[in-house]
């Protein structure tokens, strides 16, 4: 009989250690399967005019990019969740059924992509469309990337990031949680996120309305009316005022950058913070500047569109 306590301890730990290793290996295999497509499909549709694209998914990423005229191409990647290991034959049959009969429909120049109503199965879509395409998407969870289309875009997600670039139509975006990024946008934009940052770069004219419950807002190249609201977070707005601007944040700093010759009606206030206006503008303010430096009301260079800024707790800087 082995009387060595350390030997008895090592021997008794072997089954537990083996079980732990097995669980780790099973978990690693599950992650590998979940991140690897279990199936794919591709379909091509011929169209003759401006396209209407509608995509609805329970979960999965959506990517839409512009391509040749007259053709819509759809590529799907099918993913299976952690139940793949415990129902392999049934899951394989479901994946095969989707590959053979994906949820795609064409009605004239309208392409519809419907939800896959199967538990723990999701599809990522990569879609190529003509530039003249209106896009409407709705996903429960998943990232969305939309690039290079000229039509209107109405994009919704329960959770996930949105990345937009080179769009020229009327854009409406909303995600429950996730970041929004828009670059080279030429047109009006309305929307926001419940939790996440919003970043927009405008290259054309259009009214912009952005909001976030928790996160920062950065909008550059503005040329129209602007409304920005954050529950908690900083807001930066840069551009040319061709209409009223209204900016509010409950907790955060606000920075506004306008052309040096801008004329506007100033209505600025902070409950707990400081106001700062660059010297060239300060010298031309007509009105009253409260001694407490908590609010400014008056005309800048004779007045113009209203610039209204309020922050509950944070500083305001106008340059």
Positions of the model-derived regions?
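Intrinsically disordered, low-complexity terminal regions
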Residues: 1-319
């Amino acid at each position: 009989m082995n009387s060595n306590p350390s030997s008895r301890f090592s021997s008794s730990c072997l089954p537990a250690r083996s079980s732990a290793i097995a669980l780790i290996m099973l978990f690693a295999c599950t992650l590998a399967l979940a991140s690897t497509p279990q199936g794919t499909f591709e379909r091509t549709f011929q169209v003759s005019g401006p396209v209407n694209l509608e995509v609805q998914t329970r979960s999965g990423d959506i990517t839409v990019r512009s391509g040749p005229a007259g053709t819509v191409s759809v590529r799907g990647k099918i993913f299976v969740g952690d139940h793949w290991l415990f129902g392999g034959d049934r899951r394989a049959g479901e994946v095969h059924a989707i590959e053979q009969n994906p949820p795609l429909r064409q009605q004239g120049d309208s392409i519809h992509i419907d939800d896959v109503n199967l538990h723990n199965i999701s599809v990522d879509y990569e879609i190529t469309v003509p530039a003249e395409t209106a896009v409407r998407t709705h996903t429960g969870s998943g990232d969305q990337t939309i690039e290079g289309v000229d039509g209107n875009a109405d994009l919704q997600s329960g959770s996930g990031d949105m990345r937009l670039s080179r769009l020229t139509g009327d854009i409406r975006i909303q995600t429950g949680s996730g970041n929004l990024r828009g670059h080279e946008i030429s047109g009006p934009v309305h929307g926001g996120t419940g939790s996440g940052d919003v970043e927009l770069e405008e290259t054309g004219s259009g009214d912009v309305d952005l909001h976030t419950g928790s996160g920062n807002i950065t909008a550059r190249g503005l040329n129209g009316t602007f409304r920005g609201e954050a529950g908690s977070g900083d807001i930066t707005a840069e551009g040319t005022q061709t209409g009223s601007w209204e900016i509010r944040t409950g907790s955060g700093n606000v920075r506004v950058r306008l052309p040096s010759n801008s004329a506007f009606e100033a209505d600025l206030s902070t409950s707990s913070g400081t106001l700062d206006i660059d010297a060239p503008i300060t010298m031309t303010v007509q009105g009253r500047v409260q001694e407490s430096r908590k609010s400014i009301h008056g005309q800048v260079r004779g007045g113009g569109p209203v610039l209204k800024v309020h922050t509950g707790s944070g500083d305001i800087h106008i340059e």
